[in-house]
A protein has these predicted regions:
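A short Gly-Trp-Pro
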Residues: 1-12, 18-183
Length: 183
């Protein structure tokens, strides 16, 4: 990993009105094929002018960071939260200005999952694909990274190590007033 990846980078929406500041190396770079990510991706892509969320194979490419290392420095008032169900602890934040999917926030967790398209280069190579048992029928996955049918022990171990480094805290994401949307 290059030194720049351990520094501070900015992640922004397509039009640049929403900007996140990200410090430090990512926890993991993964693609998810769960039914929730696929459904959320379809919903976000239906918004006017929205950039693609789902890859051609139906996966969602994510770069996961510690929640205490990501903050919104501009445009937080433009973020809208999409929840697949009203009671869901998982929300996907979308920049309403250009309908760019920004990140997924599991509100009970200690990490933020940034959509790969929002993270500037260089990004570490894809480390794994998870939840591949839910991929679309007929999709053949390349063997360039491990393909796990569910969440892998390796994925969970990386999250646990990050949580331990945070003193087992699960902070709230600060710097954004995200209004829930029901679409």
């Amino acid at each position: 990993m290059s030194p720049k990846q351990h520094g501070t980078v900015t992640a922004s929406c397509r039009c640049g009105a929403v900007v996140l500041e990200v410090t430090g190396a990512p926890i993991v770079h993964a693609a998810c094929y769960c039914t929730s990510c696929q459904e959320a991706g379809r919903r976000i892509e239906q918004r006017p002018g929205a950039p693609s969320v789902l890859d051609a194979d139906g996966g969602t490419d994510f770069v996961v960071y510690r929640k205490d290392r990501v903050r919104c420095v501009r445009g937080g008032e433009r973020l809208e939260a999409l929840r697949l169900k009203p009671e869901s602890p998982t929300r996907r934040l979308v920049a309403a200005c250009c309908n760019s999917a920004m990140f997924l926030d599991f509100t009970k967790g200690h990490w933020l999952t940034l959509y790969r398209a929002r993270v500037p280069e260089p990004v570490p190579p894809l480390e794994m694909r998870v939840m591949t048992a839910n991929r679309r029928e007929g999709v053949m996955l390349p063997q360039d990274a491990p393909n796990y049918p569910a969440h892998s022990g390796r994925f969970m171990w990386k999250l646990l190590l990050a949580w331990a480094a945070m003193g087992f805290r699960a902070p709230k994401f600060e710097g954004a007033q995200a209004y829930d949307i029901r679409r």
